[in-house]
Amino acid sequence: MSPAGKLPSEAERILVRKSGAWTNPSYGSYPEKRPILEYIEKGVVNIDKPKGPTSHEVAAWVKAILGVSTAGHAGSLDPKVTGLLPTLLGKATKAVPALRLSGKEYVCLLKLHKEMPQKLVRKVCEEFTGPIYQMPPIKSAVKRVIRIRTIYYLEVLEIEGSFVLFRVGCEAGTYIRKLCHDIGLALGCGGHMQELRRTKAGPFTEETLVTLQDLKDAYVLWKEDGDESEIRRVIMPMETAVSHLPKIILRDSAVDAICSGAALAVPGITSLDANLKKGELIALFTLKGELVALAKAEMSTEELLKASTGLAATSVRIMMEIGTYPKGWTKKEYGVES
């Protein structure tokens, strides 16, 4: 389990250096310094979803406000649920799957069908941490089979009569409505979810929330007055959406190879996450902090630090355009056929 109040995505990540390198300022761009149109098309906005609309409706409104090519949210919230709805814009939407798989935190109001001793309520809630079995609700978009989901932490915040306010950190795909039902069953009195708000989603927290009105105001300020300050505040670089993933930092000379579909060779690495595991999803970055691709690690950190040749990672989703950095590789070297 995670430390109290922490999702796995909030674990501190340490980079270890494999080899020295420098980055050419003539190529690429630091994410926060991208030209405004590119900044928006490669951005993410942490929307505070109001009660009422569906998640898809909110994403459609974001798309309409900004005039972007597309917008995709990272994890649906039911119409009555409020809170974090990270919405990726334009080219950044290719990173949506990486964010959807990250852990989530909610604050929930549970209504018990009968007032129960507070000590018992707290004890039963504690028992719902760790792996739990869940059957998706009847009104669900997924096949109804029993699944295992992990509850990282569950903290009872307040009990008043038959109402229980709690905070829960859980694996993606956990049904909080079903969790409330199961807690009620375990207490022997029954219960249901009264209200729900999402407070964390992967690397996103309530500290960076913006409303749809905030977004609209920032857009109007930019379009009518030429002031980019607010639009750059409410929209974050797409790199924020994958900041929770283990990472490898690339040499400038390796970047275009990845953009062209090649696997990452060991010589292209300058630094890497201290705890990479073979087979896990990782993010490949430039020395300027730009996201190049999502990839699958082909070696662990220990193996990579010892290796001088071989394939370090294979791309899953390429995020950067070919030609952003100059070619510094050969097709033969990287295994790309002519």
Curated annotation (Swiss-Prot):
Keyword annotations from UniProtKB, A to Z: Isomerase, tRNA processing
Function per UniProt: Could be responsible for synthesis of pseudouridine from uracil-55 in the psi GC loop of transfer RNAs.
Catalytic activity: uridine(55) in tRNA = pseudouridine(55) in tRNA
Family statement drawn from the similarity comment of this UniProt entry: Belongs to the pseudouridine synthase TruB family. Type 2 subfamily.
Stretches assigned to the PUA domain: 245-320
InterPro entries: Dyskerin-like, PsdUridine_synth_cat_dom_sf, PsdUridine_synth_N, PUA, PUA-like_sf, PUA_sf, tRNA_PsdUridine_synth_B_fam, TruB_arch
Protein name (database record): Probable tRNA pseudouridine synthase B
Pfam families according to UniProt: DKCLD, PUA, TruB_C_2, TruB_N
EC number from the UniProt entry: 5.4.99.25
